[in-house]
């Protein structure tokens, strides 16, 4: 049996989980999310504890058991606490600011880079060098953070660019030259 799949999920207060056809709907104080439930799996909700159960031991069902439980856990945490990713900007003259709902960045190009946040994502800028991406959908928060980082990924010589706050940039030595 899948070790991740058989683990129970304790629901926080004000969070509801119900199965509708091929989806699991999760409602909470921050919003509503749904994740697909694969054939051969079912959701059992008892007294605020959710368990995923398999109807058979097919290899595909066993493989999807842990995945579905992890996706469901991400939805539960998202609607109760939310997800966030922090980015940092390094480099002389590099900065970010909010203009309406858009994120406007000066990243050393001849033009400003404008990023429009998708629905359900909130972007905050602190001190012009720190960007915080928040939302209830873990996948979407990570994708938005990756899109922003891709506008100017950190380079390996001085580390200039946009990086995740917890990311370590391995630096290279520059040219040594003749002596």
UniProtKB/Swiss-Prot annotation:
Alphabetized UniProt keyword annotations: Ribonucleoprotein, Ribosomal protein, RNA-binding, rRNA-binding
Which is one Pfam family of this protein?
Ribosomal_L6
> SUPFAM superfamilies, per this entry?
Ribosomal protein L6
Family recorded in the similarity comment: Belongs to the universal ribosomal protein uL6 family.
> InterPro entries, per this entry?
Ribosomal_uL6-like, Ribosomal_uL6-like_a/b-dom_sf, Ribosomal_uL6_a/b-dom, Ribosomal_uL6_bac-type, Ribosomal_uL6_CS
Q: Which GO terms describe its biological process?
A: cytoplasmic translation
Gene label: rplF
Please provide one cellular component term from the Gene Ontology annotations of this protein: cytosolic large ribosomal subunit
Single GO molecular function: structural constituent of ribosome
Q: Which residues form the signal peptide?
A: none
Q: Which cysteines are joined by disulfide bonds?
A: none
According to its UniProt entry, the function of this protein is described as: This protein binds to the 23S rRNA, and is important in its secondary structure. It is located near the subunit interface in the base of the L7/L12 stalk, and near the tRNA binding site of the peptidyltransferase center.
Protein's name in the database? Large ribosomal subunit protein uL6
Q: Which organism is it from?
A: Leptospira borgpetersenii serovar Hardjo-bovis (strain JB197)
Q: How does it assemble?
A: Part of the 50S ribosomal subunit.
